[in-house]
Amino acid sequence: MSYHVDRFYAAVSVLAGHGHIKQRLINAYEDNLVAICEDELPISVKQSFSDLKHLMNRVTPLNGEGTICASVRKMSVEEAADCAVSVVTLYHEISRVDAGREAVLPLDSKDRSSVPPFLVKSN
């Protein structure tokens, strides 16, 4: 999961940079989020990320322009800002979930040798 946290952090960093919001949104999404599959994300953010992905890919490109560029070009400044807020909100939620993860112990009885003896329940 920390890979996704890192990707969203990088996207938020781009969004916080200089330049027009539409160009920052394009760069943040294309460089950091485009390769993320919503099925890899926590359940609590799957739908929000899917919605963002839909917004970023909803326009058919023209003249060699990419889908993301075309979609953001058709957005108003307010819509682009809302998408940027969605990225920040997703980053916050993914970070919160990642920080709250507990260590997962192996369930396979063959792997009990890697579990400290005081944690193994005797049968």
Model-derived features: positions:
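Amphipathic alpha-helical binding modules
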Residues: 70-123
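Short terminal alpha-helical segments
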Residues: 1-31, 84-88
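Amphipathic alpha-helical interaction modules
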Residues: 19-67
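Long, hydrophobic, amphipathic alpha-helical segments used as structural scaffolds
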Residues: 16-19, 23, 37-40, 91-105
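Acidic-enriched, low-complexity/disordered segments with a strong bias for Aspartate over Glutamate
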Residues: 6, 31, 39, 51, ...
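Non-transmembrane, amphipathic alpha-helical segments
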Residues: 7-17, 37-44, 68-82
